[in-house]
Amino acid sequence: MAATVYQRLHSVAVGVGSAAGSAIGSGSASLPGSGTGSGSGIGHAGNTSSSTSSALLSHSQLTRSLERILEEAHFSGELILTNRKLKDFPRTGTKYSLTDTVIADLSRNRFAELPEEVTTFAFLETLLLYHNTIRSIPESVKQLSSLTYLDLRSNQLSSLPREICFLPLQVLLVSNNRLTSLPDELGRLDQTLTDLDASYNQLANLPARLGELRSLRSLSLRSNHLLYLPRELTCLSLISLDVSNNKIASLPLEIRHMSTLVELQLENNPLTSPPASLCMRGLVHVFKFLETQATKDEKGSRSGGNYDGYTTLRRAPRHNSSGNVLEASTTGSTNNQRRHQVDSGYNTSDGLDKRWSHDAPTKSKTDSPLHCVSNSTAATLPRTLPSAVHSQADLMDASLTSSTSTIVDESLTLSPTASPCKLSYAHSNSSSNGSSPDQDDDIMLDHQERTVHHANGRSGKGLGNIQTYKEYKEALKQQRNQEISVYKQKHPNANHSPNDDEDLSPSPPSISNGSSSNTLPKSIMKQNSNQIGHNGNGNGSANGNGVDDVVIPKKPIQKVIPSRITEIKPASTSDIRSANSSDCLGYVKPQSPMKNGTSKFNTSNGGGVQTTVGIVSSTTIKSPVSSTTKLGTVKTHRSVTWNHDIPAEKLSFTMRREFDRQREETELMSQLRTIIETRLKMTLPVDIASALTDGVILCHLANYVRPRSVASIHVPSPGVNKLTMARCRRNVDNFLEACRRIGVDENLICCAADVLEGKGAVQVAITVGELFRLHGNGGCGSGNSSGAATPTKSPTRTTRATMSPTPLA
């Protein structure tokens, strides 16, 4: 009986073994765990127990499943070979065709490289290869022209081939590998790639072209060796950014402009800017910190460029098609866009554009819609000066009415082949009938900051450096110490008529630095079309009935006040043919004196600057102009009457007022420092304005004058040593309100921006000085507390009037 059962089991085992052998021989002989000797192995199992035969049955079932999977992939286009411990791709032979496979899942196997068979799937869109031992990817991967999803997580890749960057990938997952860098060609995926996961690698830096991935929305760089984030990264439109578990110490300030960012992971980084404690609060707090830091850096860059707290930075000049520099303020309506501010923070001119720093804008007159001189007129300029002195023409249209005048900086570009033209300027001051103008001498300007480089027969114009406010103050000191006069006046020629041609030889300039080139600053006064006709009604003629009234500044410094000019000397030039064409009149802004400059001209206040001032030609105006004609200013609602009765000794009034203002500012800042350090028993840094921006010290000062005048003061916490902008504003508002309640005059109270922006330290000093003056008069504090504040009233009002942006009469 037992022998019969044994024979039956043996026959079943042999049958199974032969079936398995035939299945393997049909195309699966290379699969791991199977072989051609399976039949003999099963035959040997006939001598074992029944449990061995059941294991062989399960292995036979697995073999059938692999064949079934290949068959399903042949019909459906989905190849699922996950978790089969495969080291090689199964050979399908000619029985199954997988070239039209769309999805291939080869994850959780033992592939050492991407199988070559997979790279032949031209229609493959999704390829999953995670949890393998892949060390390399063949170059043939570029044949997968339809691949959009590639998962290479948890492999052993040390680098990615550049061919991957030529695929239309939308999702690229390469986390948990050994990558030390990403391919530089990653920017080629800018149109398609939306998700990039390179976490848990060994990346020390990121490719520069990463910022070109404009379609990228999710970027994970967790657990790498990154020391910083490149600025190119901030150009992306990311929604999620994960840079946690790296070595990043600071974030780029530009990251605050990533408006699309929703999720930002920064934990486990040695961050100092922003602090790690602040990063835990969320994205909004990080962006606020970076915004504040950027504002402070901008202020620091201004101070590093020798700009004081009142300096107004100007736009960089832009170039037109002809290569000339165009001032940004000359575009559009010049009446509305003319700037009235000056760099020192106050304005003492009567609307004319006189600034501490000269931008020296140059502009082709043919490109300007406001220019009234034709090319034929400009061609008549004589070229008689020697080639050692290169000058640029200042052209100015005389203005009769203040409501229609404007000033445009402009220069005359000389032809490269033409020799430099001789510029002789005529000062015309017509009488009531416009028939007897006088004549004055020409004055040459040796400009120390703008030169014209001449080489190989070509002359080029160089843009001078911007003269800062500090340099201007140094120039004033030099001018005060020098005893050389600036101008020399000649007797007028009463027999000169506006249309006479008379040669006036300019005085030779003294070039201290040995330069063979010289450039003159440009300024053109334009007149509105309703005052001067351009089509015949206002053109100049030989027998015109009027001449222009042109005022030439007689001061060697930049700030020129028309009412301080003593007299106006008319003159004309013979070098300009203006009989049948309308020309423009111009003047040159005086510049700061040079250290070694010498002059042949004398005036009462002295100085070392040489100035060339004059008029190219005169334009005929219909109505006669008297010597007291009001010239138009930039502000159309103001008019200025020229005063010719001021004595010459008062010409230095502006300079004296400048010194007085500087002295008063120094006294006010010293007084502010003394008040704070003596009352609050603390030491202030050199930059007082930055120490007052949070308003804490000012609130304590208000409470010192009147206890509990500021009920609550926001102070920085130990973890975060700086207040938010909202709390700083609240402190400053509380201080200003306390000043009003104590009785400080509203006109002497600074505004919140003076404190928060750190630009109005003088206004803050005025407010604090007035506060303690009231404190001393009221007897609220100690007797000696008002000692430093008593002299505040007079200089305070004087300084505020001087600092006012409205022009002084």
Curated annotation (Swiss-Prot):
Signal peptide: none annotated. CDD domains: CH_LRCH. It is found in: Cytoplasm, Cytoskeleton; Cytoplasm, Cell cortex; Cleavage furrow. Residues 662-776 form the Calponin-homology (CH) domain. It comes from the Eukaryota. Residues 27-53, 295-373, 423-442, 490-550, 783-809 are annotated as: Disordered. Disruption phenotype: Embryos homozygous for a null allele of the gene are viable and do not display gross developmental defects, developing to adult stage, albeit with a slightly decreased viability. Homozygous females are sterile, laying rare embryos that display no sign of development. Mutant flies display increased lethality at extreme temperatures. Residues 351-368 have a biased composition (Basic and acidic residues). PROSITE patterns: CH, CNMP_BINDING_3, LRR. Keywords: Cytoplasm, Cytoskeleton, Leucine-rich repeat, Repeat. One of its GO terms (cellular component) is cleavage furrow. InterPro entries: CH_dom (IPR001715), CH_dom_sf (IPR036872), cNMP-bd_dom (IPR000595), Leu-rich_rpt (IPR001611), Leu-rich_rpt_typical-subtyp (IPR003591), LRR_dom_sf (IPR032675), LRR_domain-containing (IPR050216). SUPFAM superfamilies: Calponin-homology domain, CH-domain, L domain-like. Residues 34-44 have a biased composition (Gly residues). Residues 319-336, 518-532, 788-809 have a biased composition (Polar residues). The keyword Cytoplasm applies. May play a role in the stabilization of the actin-rich cell cortex during cell division. This is Leucine-rich repeat and calponin homology domain-containing protein.
